[in-house]
Each structure stands twice: as structure tokens, then as C-alpha cells.
Amino acid sequence: MTPVRFATIISGTLKAWGIAEYCVLKEEDFSCLITLNSNMIVEVIYEEQPFGSIWRIREKDQKESIHPSVGAALKSLALILCPNRKVGRVVFAS
């Protein structure tokens, strides 16, 4: 994972959800802070560990969740930031 790729994943996802303007990216730290309002603050952190990469999601006043993949992390983030949004899948075929 590069800082640019991290920024592309996070900013592209939040732009698709219509909330990109609420995000402050720290590419060098592989983290971002999303502030929708004073009660909805979420931090997303990407880390490389000896056993593999992990995504940490910290919601204000909630227990941190840890995910082994970007897909799982984005699903969890969607449930926090867009709980009423319909969930779908994209299938790429060749």
C-alpha cells in the first residue's frame, strides 16, 4: 500500500457516498479523520503488521473494529457513515 493508493481508496469511496468534504487525510500516516458532526467522528487507519495488513476503524465513543481487508473495512465504514444506504456488490467479468 502506498500513501497515494490509500488516499485514492478513501477519498474515492467518500466521494461516491457524497461525504468527501468531511474527511481530512493524512497520507503519510495512512489515516484519515471523518467528521460529519460533533457526535459522528470516525478515524480510519491502515497498518502493516508482521502477520499482514489491517484496517482500524475508530468511531467516537465506540469500540475499535479491526478488518483484514479493504472490502471488509469499507463495509464496516458504510454501516457507520451511511446506515440507510442500500448495500450492493459489483461484479467484474471478462
What are these regions (language model features)?
Residues 9, 17, 39, 77-80, ...:
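Low-complexity, intrinsically disordered/propeptide-like segments
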